[in-house]
Regions:
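Residue-level marker for the onset of beta-strands and adjacent loop->beta junctions
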Residues: 15, 62-65
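Glycine-rich phosphate/adenosyl-contacting loop at the front of the ribokinase-like
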Residues: 1-29, 36-43, 99
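Ribokinase/PfkB-type carbohydrate-kinase core domain
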Residues: 31, 39-57, 64, 69-200
Length: 200
């Protein structure tokens, strides 16, 4: 039996919370549903001065992830909700200006909301050399499930990839970049060299 439970808002919320705390005007463009989980999200956004500009769904609650932690390891059980039920128009509300940062979380790279990300990229970001705002992409461990078409479009807009070593290795595998494990135990060894090749 669990000693305690602690409901909290996850996903990209921590990034938005940090941005808001340093005084940046912060907006959330994801779909929010209707129900207890959606209410938790709306309250967290409101409490942190984050404006929700995305769509609302009244026929489904937002999804949740259950994290079971026994102090030695964590087990994740996830169910997707309203946030995954977007379409190609989902992110039409996003109009980045000069100097803005657009943060794309992994949850939007799958299911129906992925078409909204792809439409946004084609509408605003097709030429990274002339774009006057930044795209930060946090793929998490779902990168292996992103469609080939969307992954290609993401690579072409040259975002800032925010990922750990495991996620970077998955990205390298998807892009056919060889990771040299023979020097991986040395400081600045094979893995770091491979990641440099991946970035190039």
């Amino acid at each position: 039996a669990a000693n305690h439970t602690m409901p909290s808002v996850g996903g990209s919320f921590r990034v938005m919370q940090a941005a808001s705390r340093i005084g940046a005007a912060t907006k959330h463009a994801g779909v929010i549903g209707n129900g207890p989980w959606a209410s938790l999200i709306r309250k967290a956004l409101n409490d942190n001065g984050i404006e929700h500009i995305g769509q609302d769904r009244i026929d489904a609650d937002s999804g949740f992830r259950l994290v079971l932690n026994d102090s030695e390891r964590k087990t994740f059980v996830a169910t997707y909700g309203a946030e995954s039920q977007g379409n190609e128009n989902t992110f039409d509300c996003v109009e980045p200006g000069e100097g803005d940062v657009v943060h794309i979380s992994a949850n939007t790279l799958m299911d129906h909301s992925a078409s909204g990300i792809d439409a946004f990229l084609h509408r605003t970001s097709s030429d990274p050399t002339t774009r006057d705002y930044s795209i930060v992409l946090n793929p998490t461990n779902t990168l292996h499930m992103v469609s080939d078409h969307l992954l290609e479009d993401l690579v072409l807009v040259r975002p800032i990839w925010s990922c750990n070593r495991q996620e970077a290795r998955t990205l390298a595998d998807r892009l056919g970049v060889f990771v040299d494990d023979s020097l991986s135990m040395t400081v600045g060894g094979g893995f770091d060299d491979s990641m440099k090749a991946l970035c190039n």
